[in-house]
């Protein structure tokens, strides 16, 4: 029986064969930001330290990819949020700041205009000259 770490490594090796552009020799020069889905969690959430969303029981996929030389980061957006709210939260997390959902949106859906504060940007130098892969 293979360990979770062995299964993770095998899965990633198969992925490199199927997607050669994702291999270290063909990697993008930009950071890759992983954004979890509904009911998920990211690196800023306490649960991530115990059970990383990207890998779960198999281990920390992003930690493995970073150790292989990739620049991978895990965003933390609302676990049950609209696409609008998640986009606002992701932008605030990428750039550093507080999620601003807008006055009209907040009034229409009956929630606060401002959400989570992200004092430290996930990608400090993100901009036109430094894009990210999502």
Model regions and ranges:
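N-terminal non-catalytic accessory region
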Residues: 2-134
């Amino acid at each position: 029986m293979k360990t979770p770490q062995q299964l993770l490594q095998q899965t990633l090796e198969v992925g490199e064969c199927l997607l050669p552009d994702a291999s270290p020799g063909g990697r993008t020069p930009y950071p890759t930001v992983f954004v979890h889905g509904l009911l998920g969690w990211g690196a800023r959430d306490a649960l991530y330290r115990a059970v990383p969303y990207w890998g779960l029981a198999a281990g920390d996929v992003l930690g493995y990819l970073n150790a292989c030389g990739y620049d991978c980061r895990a965003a933390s957006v609302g676990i049950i949020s609209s696409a609008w709210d998640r986009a606002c939260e992701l932008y605030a997390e990428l750039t550093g700041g507080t999620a601003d959902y807008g006055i009209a949106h907040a009034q229409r859906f009956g929630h606060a205009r401002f959400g989570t504060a992200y004092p430290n940007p996930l990608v400090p130098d993100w901009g036109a000259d430094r894009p990210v892969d999502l």
